[in-house]
A protein has these predicted regions:
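Short, charged, surface-exposed secondary-structure boundary motifs
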Residues: 30-33, 149-151, 199-204
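Active-site HxH/HxHxD metal-binding segment of metal-dependent hydrolases
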Residues: 1-57, 71-79, 162-169
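Short acidic/glycine-rich loop or secondary-structure boundary segments that cap or lie
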Residues: 30, 62, 69, 75-78, ...
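Cap/insert and terminal regions of metallo-dependent hydrolase folds
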Residues: 2-11, 96-102, 106-113, 117-193
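Active-site-proximal loop/helix segment associated with metal-binding centers of metalloenzymes
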Residues: 35-36, 57-108
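Active-site regions of enzymes building and remodeling cell-envelope glycoconjugates
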Residues: 49-53, 64, 186-192
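Short, basic/aromatic-enriched C-terminal tail that caps enzymatic domains
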Residues: 189-206
Length: 206
């Protein structure tokens, strides 16, 4: 669910004029055991398919939308875990998914964060989004949080999101039912479904 959809996107759409923004490591080779789990295309392939723009740091997609690039490790309880291995400059090493990133919508009243799988840690992402955008108010978060167990990390994550004042939480994939149930006890958790439409600053976001 990270990059394999690109193959089907290429089959259905003309991508030559489309700009694709991603972390520079996004298209590196990745293995989990004996299985290849990386993107179907290399960075060189992408440069020939579309207007590929590697971004290791924050970059503006539009006046309101920001791609965060690589997320720094700042929150002590969000320790990264390796998921398989990746080949960097010809050498295989543990993959800590440094290419995991997020988008931020900069609204008039605060920020709205759109995550992928949050391998970087949802609290790390929130803290970095606030710093990059210079806004503390978190209107909402939607996406995967990579939370499965009802453990200490979940408890501390819930406390963090409560303390930072996250107003609406839309947990999608990568969040277990048990984790969602615990979050609902404290946070304003919203149901997410296909076709859901959010309205930010009076503009519809599909």
């Amino acid at each position: 669910d990270h990059t394999r959809g690109l193959k089907f996107m290429k089959e259905r759409l003309e991508l030559s004029g489309m700009e694709v923004i991603a972390h520079p490591s996004c298209f590196d080779e990745k293995m989990f055991g004996e299985e290849s789990i990386g993107a179907p295309y290399s960075a060189a392939d992408m440069a020939g398919i579309c207007r590929y723009r590697p971004c290791g740091g924050p970059c503006n997609i539009s006046e309101r939308l920001v791609f965060l690039g690589e997320i720094p490790d700042a929150v002590d309880f969000e320790t990264r875990k390796a998921i398989g291995r990746t080949r960097i400059r010809g050498k295989w090493q543990d993959d800590y998914v440094r290419d995991d990133s997020a988008l931020v919508y900069r609204g008039e009243e605060g920020i709205f964060i759109i995550t992928g799988c949050s391998h970087s840690g949802i609290c790390n992402i929130v803290q970095y989004a606030q710093a990059v955008c210079g806004q503390q108010r978190v209107l909402g978060i939607i996406g995967g949080f990579h939370l499965f167990e009802a453990d200490e990390r979940l408890v501390r994550t819930i406390d963090y999101l409560k303390c930072c004042g996250a107003e609406q939480i839309y947990p999608c994939h990568c969040v277990s039912l048990r984790a969602k149930a615990r979050m609902m006890e404290v946070l304003n958790v919203k149901e997410v479904g296909v076709g859901m439409e959010l309205c930010l600053d009076g503009q519809a976001a599909h």
